[in-house]
Regions:
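Residue-level signature of beta-propeller blades and closely related beta-rich strand-turn architectures
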Residues: 7-8, 83, 91, 127, ...
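Surface-exposed loop and turn segments in beta-propeller and other repeat-based domains
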Residues: 38-58, 294-300, 404-409
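Conserved blade-ending motifs and adjacent loop-strand segments that build the rim/top face
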Residues: 46-52, 101-111, 147-151, 353-362, ...
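Signature of short aromatic-glycine-proline-rich micro-motifs recurring in repeat-based ectodomains
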Residues: 52-68, 110, 148-152, 204, ...
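Blade-level signature of beta-propeller repeat domains, shared across WD40, Kelch, NHL, RCC1
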Residues: 409-445
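C-terminal outer-membrane/trafficking sorting elements
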Residues: 450-529
Length: 529
């Protein structure tokens, strides 16, 4: 009989790299429960093996929810942990070794991502810190000096420096102890050093760094009482976090802040809520003043709703903001404030009229031949459906780059859609517990169709009322088939135009398939009333 504790962290888990953590305890009985022995002896090393998954090292088996014996080998056991599945091949060993079995299926909540031009991709996620990726296709160890949940990243664009904040709970202590931490990296997240938190004014929260890395800004999750108490919830440190002083000039205690990636003296803050004010600092964050508004005073047609500012890393004061950011997913519909752009540090704003609703915006590497970063956004462009869009002309035109089968529930907790500054066309989006999804511009495949070598077009289908729109077909030889779930053909026809009118007698779940010879070019599932 084998049993474990559940969220009672008295066990010690040691890894081959010398790291360790507290977790659940295993108990084994081989006499029907008359006697028991503990399988987690303190000091034994190693007791767990990352098994090629660099990010899991330093964690533990915890929240144990299920145990399963191999029905053909009682020495082999699986356990379901809060971070995945572990297995031991010899439960009877003096110190059983548990190997991590989950490859590529860990579900995480991403909060922030930064693509460093000429450098790595740096992430902040809940529960497992995040990492600095040279190659996003390779399993990578989490940030050194682990926190657990990295609440925020501050980025110094001119020097590649980072700040990372959070709260650490030491479950090995009796009772468990929780404390605030703030880590600094001077090498784009490859290594991290702890800063002095003795004077930290509150629980580590949202961060920003000046472009040269010399000034830190912090909006704590909550402020401490006593010697560090203040009515301000924005603080500034000019000595690497040793001392903090409240910033002045703000009429808000909450909001999103960023540094100017080109001018180290400038910071920007948009308060949370719907007031639409934009604040800026030109003295490295010591004082702020209102410089502009996101409300169109003539028509009152748009305002900020907790929008996250994005800055062009190659031009000072060049800012973008999504004006519908409070709604990462809303089944009943969205506001239609859209997207706004400023080139003077937030003093004046121009609404991008091609964008109907913009819930998140980000920038990435410029397209070949372009001198301006590519824009990515989650929202609705013109009369197109909700999705991920790309623009290579500062938002004048947009191309949807996902389809209805790849929405992932929208940007969710992290609220971000951002491009990669090293790979044109690569885009990242946060999700609700599904990790960071990314997309690339793929090569158009060459396919053999009916004995002919042809370039298969990258086609998309989308439903607009009872019209099925066909995008980027590039041939007149395709055939459209509409089927029910059993595969019965409901409607079929040769495609002669970019839109097909659906028969009025079609109702319920319909599967559309566009075919060229024996090759399926695109498919779409939808429900008709």
């Amino acid at each position: 009989v084998l049993l474990t504790t559940e969220s009672c962290y008295g066990g010690n888990y040691s890894w081959a790299d010398g790291s360790g953590n507290a977790g659940d305890i295993f108990f084994l009985s081989e006499d029907a429960g008359a006697t028991w022995k503990t399988l987690n002896p303190w000091g034994a090393s190693p007791t767990v093996d990352a098994n090629g998954n660099g990010w899991i090292s330093g964690s533990s088996i915890h929240w144990a929810g299920t145990l399963e014996f191999d029905p053909f080998d009682s020495k082999k056991v699986w356990v379901g942990s809060g971070n995945g599945v572990f297995r031991t091949d010899d439960l009877t060993a003096a110190v059983p070794l548990w190997k991590f079995q989950s490859k590529g299926i860990e579900e995480t909540v991403p909060l922030e991502v930064v693509s460093v031009p000429g450098g790595p991709l740096v992430t902040a996620i809940m529960d497992y810190d995040g990492a600095s990726y040279k190659d996003i296709t390779v399993s990578t160890p989490v940030h050194s000096n682990p926190i657990g949940s990295s609440n925020s990243l501050g980025y110094a664009a001119l020097v590649g420096g980072f700040l990372r904040s959070g709260r650490v709970t030491d479950y090995g202590a009796k009772p468990a102890v929780t404390y605030d931490v703030l880590y600094h990296s001077a090498d784009s997240g490859r290594t991290w050093k702890a800063t002095d938190t003795a004077s930290l004014p509150g629980s580590a929260g949202t961060l920003a760094m000046s472009a040269d890395g010399r000034v830190f800004l912090l909006r704590p999750s909550y402020t401490h009482t006593g010697k560090n108490a203040s009515t301000s919830t924005f603080y500034r440190s000019a000595d690497a976090g040793k001392t903090w002083k409240p910033v002045t000039g703000l009429s808000t205690q909450d909001g999103k802040m960023i540094s100017d990636p080109v001018n180290p003296a400038n910071f920007y803050i948009v308060p949370s809520g719907y007031q639409g004010d934009v604040y800026a600092s030109t003295d490295t964050g010591a004082t702020f003043s209102k410089v502009g508004t996101l409300i169109n005073n003539a028509t009152g047609e748009y305002s900020a709703s907790s929008g996250l500012l994005r800055a062009n890393p190659y031009a000072a004061g060049d800012l973008w903001i999504a004006l519908d950011a409070a709604q990462s997913w809303n089944a009943s519909g969205f506001s239609s404030n859209g997207l706004a752009h400023s080139t003077d540090g937030g003093k004046t704003w121009t609404r991008i009229k091609t964008m109907v609703a913009c819930l998140s915006v980000g920038l990435g590497k410029a397209a070949p031949g372009s001198d301006y970063p590519t824009l990515y956004m989650w929202g609705k462009a013109n009369s197109e459906p909700l999705g991920i869009y790309r623009s290579i002309d500062k938002g004048q035109t947009w191309l949807r780059i996902n389809d209805d089968q790849h929405q992932y529930g929208g940007p969710a907790n992290g609220g971000f859609v951002v491009g990669d500054f090293n790979v044109y066309g690569r885009v990242y989006m946060s999700t609700a517990g599904r990790g960071i999804v990314y997309g690339n511009i793929g090569e158009i495949p060459t396919t053999s169709i009916d004995g002919r070598k042809m370039t298969a077009p990258r086609v998309r289908l989308s439903l607009h009322g009872r019209d099925l729109h066909i995008q980027d077909l590039g041939t007149k030889d395709a055939r459209l088939e509409l089927m029910d779930v059993s595969g019965r053909i409901l409607q079929q026809q040769e495609v002669k135009a970019t839109a097909v009118k659906l028969n009025e007698n079609l109702h319920g779940l319909v599967i559309a398939r566009l075919r060229l010879g024996s090759t399926t070019l695109a498919s779409l599932r939808f429900v008709l009333p």
